[in-house]
Amino acid sequence: MAASTSGYSGVLFRLRKYANKSQSLCHIGNSNFIIRTTWTTGCKHQHQLNTQIESLPQMVGVVGLEIHAQIHSKSKLFSGSHVSFSDPPNSLVSHFDASLPGTLPVLNRRCVEAAVLTGLALNCTINKKSLFDRKHYFYADMPAGYQITQQRLPIAVNGTLSYSHFEGRKRNHVVTKSVKIKQIQLEQDSGKSLHDDERSQTLIDLNRAGVGLMELVMEPEMCCGEEAGAAVRELQLILQALGTCQANMAEGQLRVDANVSVHHPGEPLGVRTEVKNINSVRHLAKAIDYEIQRQMEVLQSGGTVLNETRAFDSKSGITIPMRDKEGLQDYRFMPEPNLPPLFVYESEASVPAGADSTQLVLIDRLSSQLPELPSVTRTRLVETYGILREHSFTLVNEDGLVDYFESVVKMTKTEPRKVIGWVMNELMGNLNLQNLKVSQSPVSPCALAEMINLVRSGHISSSTAKKVFQEMWKTPEKTVEQIVKEQDLWMINDKEELRQICQRIVDSHSEEVQIIRGGNKKVLNKLMGEIQKETKGKTNPLQVKAILEEMIF
């Protein structure tokens, strides 16, 4: 790669600060504007290399991902030890986890079923026979000196993941792409090394050692941080829908390694770097965009990109070297002698004679258990309720929000597109403000539906309903009607009372009335505003307008 770019080493280019704009490295053209500037929140990454390169020959980023998803299971992959994130250190360690001599692995069926389910959801081919291997490491948090994995013949191969991200200044243009899944393999997690800087020592916690992982390898078909982030977010939603992984990145249940390189289209891929253990989608996108731009600048200055492992520093927004990978590490893969081949079967008809099918993993049985996947849910929401596509993404992205929305719709005759406004603006606004989950909302779907029904029936106005919602949020023990009664928020629907109010306003604004009679009907809005102020928003604007026009004209 260095040789192919040496001809460009003398090219002069400027680095220009680009304030308040994010940069997308997804597409790099050969015009003056090499890096396309976007105004989206999805790729809003500012870092030390936040620059725009001009007069640069065409170059693109290439991104592949390796994702380690911790299987949601009560016990570990090869032992009966319990799985928990918050238990005291070294309290969940069996003899096998600690690699005591004479202990043997016993495969957890739940982990196999989770891998098959995930493979089916990602359109993979499930291998009826897969094999286990030993991958040798010499790390203190892996006491056996090796990891049991599936290097030769993994449980699932050749899948695809479709994902979407938004483009455009208003984030309303949905772009859908797909990436190939090379393989899904079962393997053990390692323990944790906890560094104590004050005492200059490293402590080992083996609670995580032996926990079941699915390693998903995505082909290098993405081109920027936004695409990679969208793919990982979609995978998170799929795993959570399946129940095969809780996918909480903050707790290490989903860890991502990004393989990043740059090259000129039509030429071989460049030397790649691996950015390890990224623990959030936002950091993933930032790390990839930084690394792509860093490599471009290295090549443009006549340097060579090293094949190395790097870490992302979230505080400074840069990647830093960890260890050199130029010398290919020999993991000394070998077949796992203590585990036979793993067989799964298509259906009961393919089960060997005399075998108990209830004790076997059947693909068609698991296929029948597949839930509605996020992409299908989004399509259904748009087609069934007529909501905007971007709203369907928000509903699906928030755990429990689809059920909340559909419950409200069922309990009210109001158009779903009006219901979505209350859910997106009032409900989500308050949840985000207080950093709460949907399940923690003090306003239940039933209460919100009751309030929306009062608006629809004309008993309270939309502006009043917003005040009522805030009271419902503060005092969830009160019903909607209690709040409306206590604060006297019922709409004034009595025509005689409305006429009296309108007459008072007309009498006290004689100058405005003359202007209106002179042909300037816009001033009528001022009188309507005065009435709304006097009644605290408890009048119907259409009714008020009709009465005022009758009185004035």
UniProtKB/Swiss-Prot annotation:
GO terms for cellular component: glutamyl-tRNA(Gln) amidotransferase complex; mitochondrion. Keywords: ATP-binding, Ligase, Mitochondrion, Nucleotide-binding, Protein biosynthesis, Transit peptide. Pfam families: GatB_N, GatB_Yqey. GO terms for molecular function: ATP binding; glutaminyl-tRNA synthase (glutamine-hydrolyzing) activity. Residues 1-18 form a transit peptide. InterPro entries: Asn/Gln-tRNA_amidoTrfase_suB/E, Asn/Gln-tRNA_Trfase_suB/E_cat, Asn/Gln_amidotransferase, Asn/Gln_tRNA_amidoTrase-B-like, GatB, GatB_Yqey_C_2, Gln_synth/guanido_kin_cat_dom. It catalyses: L-glutamyl-tRNA(Gln) + L-glutamine + ATP + H2O = L-glutaminyl-tRNA(Gln) + L-glutamate + ADP + phosphate + H(+). Its EC number is 6.3.5.-. GO terms for biological process: glutaminyl-tRNAGln biosynthesis via transamidation; mitochondrial translation. Its main location: mitochondrion. NCBIfam families: gatB, PRK05477.1-2, PRK05477.1-4. Allows the formation of correctly charged Gln-tRNA(Gln) through the transamidation of misacylated Glu-tRNA(Gln) in the mitochondria. The reaction takes place in the presence of glutamine and ATP through an activated gamma-phospho-Glu-tRNA(Gln). Subunit of the heterotrimeric GatCAB amidotransferase (AdT) complex, composed of A (qrsl1), B (gatb) and C (gatc) subunits. Belongs to the GatB/GatE family. GatB subfamily. This is Glutamyl-tRNA(Gln) amidotransferase subunit B, mitochondrial. The gene is gatb.
